[in-house]
Amino acid sequence: MLMLLVRGTRYENHRSKVTLPTPLGGRSNETTLCESPGPDTGIRWRRSDEALRVNVGGVRRLLSARALARFPGTRLGRLQAAASEEQARRLCDDYDAAAREFYFDRHPGFFLGLLHFYRTGHLHVLDELCVFAFGQEADYWGLGENALAACCRARYLERRVTRPRAWDEDSDTPSSVDPCPDEISDVQRELARYGAARCGRLRRRLWLTMENPGYSLPSKLFSCVSISVVLASIAAMCIHSLPEYQAREAAAAVAAVAAGRSAEGVRDDPVLRRLEYFCIAWFSFEVSSRLLLAPSTRNFFCHPLNLIDIVSVLPFYLTLLAGAALGDQGGTGGKEFGHLGKVVQVFRLMRIFRVLKLARHSTGLRSLGATLKHSYREVGILLLYLAVGVSVFSGVAYTAEKEEHVGFDTIPACWWWGTVSMTTVGYGDVVPVTVAGKLAASGCILGGILVVALPITIIFNKFSHFYRRQKALEAAVRNSNHQEFEDLLSSVDGVSEASLETSRETSQEGRSADLETQAPSEPPHAQMY
């Protein structure tokens, strides 16, 4: 039996001769077609001009050898030119020798666009796929960016560069803030580490109590106490700088020196010193507890919030070591300890970093950190624009005002004026007096407004996105049923990372089966392209 496929229509004939339509003004053409070897002959692999039967996610099509030969570098083009069955199997997911059909577990919607590419030579972007899924499919089938049609190339490149995830700046829809599966997998992987650990269940509960304020009532109380201690520490540091406390400490230091004692131990108010010790004890308890309860010590030291906790207590202990070193020198010190007192003051100044501990309990601060992390290009562009503008207008102002002796004596001295002018702060400590200098100042201010406004808009949009995303995650934790959350935690007892990988592969197979089930129904015969 012979089979002829013309534009998607199949014609069958049991004879070896098929009469084709007669050309205009010509004579009848009688062509003899050779039967292709059956799948069980075991003599030849495939004819070079034989149509390729493929099944992509449940969508079956027949592709002509002529269309595939136009693009030999693509996956289907290489499959058509495969010299053996083993070589062909390496290019597909499965092969049915009886039906001579190649199976691919890929997106069926993209495959329909791929068929259009083999007909026209141009690939169009599909709105049903995100830019990264579309790029992965294109790479799998061996298509590059040059294959994109001119009408879709600019849109694809813009979405790939500026929109890592499709989100609308003015929309609060859940699709713009949904957590990705990678975040959920990271949480499951962290929880799975407690399965094989000693006292894993207890450590897991304590870790969630300290890390997740919405986990239980004790976790909320712990969060409130932590915030109160941070605020008390910051308030004590600010009160310590008031003039009356400075005068009191100076008088106590003079009295100690007059009595022949060291002045190092009397420079702090007793109440503030006790409050400082209490705050340091609480911060040390937090750091040590999180370190002992953390599922991974390596990940603990890689987390920015944990590094902030360490920095908040490190200056206190360094100050104690420096004080002990000064005490060993009898309070006078040697040449090598001449500037150690200034180093101690620097360590005390580092206490201001404790305010960053509020980021663990503040959605806005965490969103700001994520924004700066993902906006380093925009921040770099902003600094570059400011540097160029300050350099140019500082030189112009120096040239116009150097004879007036009003503070524009050197170009580096003009940098301060250029910075406060471009950022539209304008302290007024240094102002131009000549007409040329005032024109330069006007251009500097207008240029600063334009230069600063352009990147700030992009950074603000990213901050809004990350803030809404973080609020949505916190709302999901608050609204989740506590018993269901406990069941989820119980389900990961004893689960290893290997089992998580196995479950992930199983879920991918399930999604592939769903694609086959949801694929559009096909006629009994395959269509030819």
UniProtKB/Swiss-Prot annotation:
Its quaternary organisation is: Heterotetramer with KCNB1. Heterotetramer with KCNB2. Does not form homomultimers.
Give the stretches traversing the membrane: 218-239, 271-293, 305-322, 341-361, 377-398, 439-467
Q: How does it sit in the membrane?
A: Multi-pass membrane protein
Signal sequence annotation = none
The alphabetical list of record keywords is: Cell membrane, Ion channel, Ion transport, Membrane, Potassium, Potassium channel, Potassium transport, Transmembrane, Transmembrane helix, Transport, Voltage-gated channel
Write out the biased-composition intervals (Basic and acidic residues): 502-514
Cited InterPro entries: BTB/POZ_dom, Ion_trans_dom, K_chnl_volt-dep_Kv, K_chnl_volt-dep_Kv5/Kv9, SKP1/BTB/POZ_sf, T1-type_BTB, VG_K_chnl, Volt_channel_dom_sf
Question: Region labeled Disordered — which residues?
Answer: 494-529
UniProt motif Selectivity filter: location: 424-429
Gene3D superfamilies in the record, alphabetically?
A: 1.10.287.70, Potassium Channel Kv1.1, Chain A (3.30.710.10), Voltage-gated potassium channels. Chain C (1.20.120.350)
Cite the SUPFAM superfamilies for this sequence. Answer: POZ domain, Voltage-gated potassium channels
Q: What is known of its domains?
A: The transmembrane segment S4 functions as a voltage-sensor and is characterized by a series of positively charged amino acids at every third position. Channel opening and closing is effected by a conformation change that affects the position and orientation of the voltage-sensor paddle formed by S3 and S4 within the membrane. A transmembrane electric field that is positive inside would push the positively charged S4 segment outwards, thereby opening the pore, while a field that is negative inside would pull the S4 segment inwards and close the pore.
User: Which molecular function GO terms apply here?
Assistant: delayed rectifier potassium channel activity; potassium channel regulator activity
What are the BP-aspect GO terms? action potential; potassium ion transport; protein homooligomerization; regulation of potassium ion transmembrane transport
Q: Which residues lie within the membrane without crossing it?
A: 412-423, 424-431
Q: Name one GO cellular component term.
A: plasma membrane
Query: Under what name is this protein listed?
Result: Delayed-rectifier potassium channel regulatory subunit KCNS1
Provide the protein's localization. Answer: Cell membrane
Q: Which residues lie on this side of the membrane: Extracellular?
A: 240-270, 323-340, 399-411, 432-438
State which ranges are Cytoplasmic (membrane side).
1-217, 294-304, 362-376, 468-529
Role summary: Potassium channel regulatory subunit that modulate the delayed rectifier voltage-gated potassium channel activity of KCNB1 and KCNB2 by altering their kinetics, expression levels, and shifting the half-inactivation potential to more polarized values. While it does not form functional channels on its own, it can form functional heterotetrameric channels with KCNB1 and KCNB2. Each regulatory subunit has unique regulatory properties that can lead to extensive inhibition, significant changes in kinetics, and/or substantial shifts in the voltage dependencies of the inactivation process.
Similarity remark: Belongs to the potassium channel family. S (TC 1.A.1.2) subfamily. Kv9.1/KCNS1 sub-subfamily.
